[in-house]
A protein has these predicted regions:
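The C-terminal cap of the DNA-recognition helix in HTH/winged-HTH DNA-binding domains
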Residues: 95, 110-111
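Short, well-ordered loop/turn sites that connect or cap secondary structure elements
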Residues: 108-109, 128
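Beta-rich strand-turn-strand
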Residues: 99-102
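Ferredoxin-like alpha/beta domains used as RNA- or RNAP-binding modules
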Residues: 1-96, 123-227
Length: 231
């Protein structure tokens, strides 16, 4: 899997992002750059990069989240995008205080320390829903690692849409969060504008074709050879 190897604080500076949103309580000693004025596209791109960086999501899965957000029948695309990102298992672990950073929470999930509704889940992007119960496996509950984590995160405020039981290393998604309850400094409207422009009609048609069966693709190729309209 591809990773962004840019130092975290350097990346935060380039995105004008306070590291506290990543769970990092320190700032770079370097002076902030007096950045040049961004174009409309530059601002849109920056917001997308910021959201991807905060949640640790690469371009392809991020685009998939956007496509899923578009298909939801309720809410706006931008708000739905943020809610889908917020309900990732690794993010919820971070919000509950079972990871000092989302990166650490992701590692804990990867290492099969987590149960969701009593069943082991090791997929950081696993999508949670209202009523789901998250718990650290019993055999890991006494580990020094979690004592050290809670020493740092125990004083953090847990979002209203979550219920944390730090004593038993459990947590519950009591409801789906609203956009107002998601404290990330991202302007999702600009992200929607960016994707709306990039997914022009020809590109949308290409994406639709990618979902066709082999038989349909062969038929389209056959018609195209004979200069027939295939769209």
């Amino acid at each position: 899997m591809a990773r962004d190897m840019t130092p975290v604080l350097k990346r935060c500076r380039s995105l004008d992002l306070d590291p506290i949103y990543l769970g990092i309580d320190k700032k770079s000693n370097r002076n902030a750059r007096s950045g040049r004025k961004l174009s409309e596209y530059g601002m849109q791109l920056k917001e997308k990069q910021k959201a991807k960086f905060i949640y640790g999501v690469l371009e392809k899965p991020f685009r998939n989240y956007y496509a899923k957000a578009q298909k939801l029948k309720y809410g706006t695309t931008g708000e739905n995008l943020m809610i889908l990102l917020e309900l990732r298992l690794d993010n919820v672990m971070f919000r509950l205080g079972y990871g000092r950073t989302r990166k650490e929470a992701r590692q804990i999930v990867d290492h099969k320390h987590v149960l969701v509704n009593g069943k082991p889940v090791n997929i950081p992007s696993y999508q949670l829903k209202a009523g789901d119960v998250i718990e650290i496996k019993e055999k890991f509950k006494g580990a020094q690692r979690y004592k050290d984590i809670l020493e740092v995160t125990g004083s953090r405020m847990v979002p209203a849409w979550l219920e944390a039981d730090h004593e038993n290393l459990k947590g519950t998604v009591t409801q789906v969060p609203t956009r107002a309850e998601i404290d990330v400094p991202v302007n999702e409207v600009l992200i929607v504008e960016l994707y709306s422009k990039s997914l022009s009609k020809p590109k949308r048609r290409v994406l639709e074709c990618l979902n066709l069966t082999d038989r349909e693709l062969k038929l389209r190729k056959f018609l195209k050879i004979r200069n027939m309209d295939v769209l």
